């Protein structure tokens, strides 16, 4: 299955040209032979993040939306809240897997509030905003994204 993956970077301080974590994710997606359906940078704002997720899922028809940034403890970090506002179902195992893998790299991973949810047939996964942490999050789940996308599209389990 060829995946279409959208990237939504959440940052008050970066634009698309400065988005190193998003650019790294683009490279990783393309290295898998998958398509980057869209890549936008939005402010750390619940409405803007939610709108970008909806557009990626509903207009770009992404199988997966990766948000990047806004998952920490700062009051401006609102990506999990924005994700919950526009999605229907939690997929806790993916966020748990990212945290477990990241904890082998840094104990600070326990401070992440990142979540994973499903919006219709689209999986929405929150990644941290640093390039290193975004790469590690990708490493933690990339091998399961195709199966997850098949499942959210209504497919059955494969062995």
Name these PLM-found stretches.
Residues 1-159:
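Non-catalytic beta/alpha edge segments that cap or flank active sites
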């Amino acid at each position: 299955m060829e995946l279409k993956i959208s990237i939504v970077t959440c940052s008050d301080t970066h634009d698309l040209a400065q988005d190193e974590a998003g650019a790294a994710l683009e490279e990783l997606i393309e290295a898998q032979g998958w398509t980057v359906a869209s890549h936008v940078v939005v402010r750390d704002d619940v409405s803007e993040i939610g709108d970008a997720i909806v557009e990626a899922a509903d207009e770009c028809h992404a199988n997966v939306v990766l948000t990047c940034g806004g998952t920490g403890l700062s009051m401006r970090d609102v990506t999990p809240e924005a994700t919950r506002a526009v999605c229907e179902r939690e997929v806790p195992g993916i966020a748990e897997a990212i945290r477990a893998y990241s904890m082998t790299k840094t104990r600070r991973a326990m401070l992440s509030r990142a979540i994973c949810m499903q919006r219709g047939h689209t999986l929405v996964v929150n990644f941290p905003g640093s390039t290193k942490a975004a790469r590690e999050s990708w490493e933690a789940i990339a091998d399961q994204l195709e199966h997850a996308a098949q499942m959210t599209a209504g497919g059955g389990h494969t062995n």
